[in-house]
Amino acid sequence: MTTVISNITSLKDAIESRNAEGVSAWYADNAVLTILDRDNPPAAPTTYRGLEEIGAYYRDICGRNMEHSVEDLVSTDGGLGYTQRCRYPDGSRVVCVTVARLVDGKITRQTAVQVWDASGS
């Protein structure tokens, strides 16, 4: 079993416990995170470049009062993917599907597509 596959649960645990530093530790210094959603379509996605920007993004997300669960987590030596389900206290839900490329056990490129339910749905 490779290091990536044996340690992948640490990424799941970091996401579910809202541990921004634990999530950020999975990224290479020069990583690129691209997020697509209703407000940020393929022509104008949100893009975070480098560990500093990605870390700030996760500190914001992990600092929010919401529940996170990770499902369908798969990994290989060269990549990983998972579905993340989030729920805010008001009942609003977010589902995010992500795929990422790994080099030397670190995420170098990630694309995430996220959608929301209406509040309380």
For each predicted feature, which ranges?
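A beta-strand edge to alpha-helix "cap/lid" segment located at domain peripheries
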Residues: 56-121
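Hydrophobic aliphatic residue packing
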Residues: 4, 8, 41-42, 54, ...
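Short, flexible micro-motifs
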Residues: 17, 21, 53, 108
